[in-house]
Amino acid sequence: MNAEYKVGDFIYNADIYDGLNNSLSDLAFYKKWLPQNKDAKILELCCGTGRLTIPIAKDGYNIKGVDYTLSMLERAKEKAFQAGLKIDFIEADIRELNLGEKFDFIFIPFNSIHHLYKNEDLFDALKVVRNHLKEKGLFLLDCFNPNIQYIVENERKQHVIAEYTTNDEKKSVDKTKHAL
């Protein structure tokens, strides 16, 4: 494994993450793929602050969440506690994970796979999925597919990529000169 960078190097602050990612508009998509059996074992890789993990657990599912970033997991544990849920949140790198158990459903949501920058790292993460997935299990991967024409045509324009308020009421606007 090439460990020149850490998964989550660029998304490490739970306040910023929650400020940017407070929508649950994609939750219905993931719920559609969940096993009908509520006793099924579910694993969310790159769970962040529990944005999806917690609502799925509230529906009665047995779910574990894995993330590399400690501040994200601390926030996830805090949210789960406030919701009266006991969820196992695990700090680990998805390129090296070994939980010693198999799951019925594993998913990597919300473009999180893009935190792996090299093919070998992606392959390592997919091997981890294979090693943790039951024989008849389901793996779901959500990733962004960019519009190359838009990127080329708008490469020099500045774009607002996010406006948000963190939990401590700080307002922020993030901009980029890179095409979106």
Language-model features: locations:
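A short SAM/SAH-binding and catalytic strip from SAM-dependent methyltransferases
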Residues: 104-120
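A short glycine-rich, Lys/Arg-flanked "PGG" loop and its adjoining helix->strand segment in the class I
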Residues: 123-135
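Conserved class I S-adenosyl-L-methionine
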Residues: 1-48
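SAM-dependent methyltransferase
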Residues: 143-180
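A short acidic, Gly/Pro-enriched loop at the edge of an enzyme's catalytic core
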Residues: 95-105
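Conserved beta-strand signature within the Rossmann-like core of class I S-adenosyl-L-methionine
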Residues: 136-143
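Class I SAM-dependent methyltransferase SAM/SAH-binding core
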Residues: 53-96
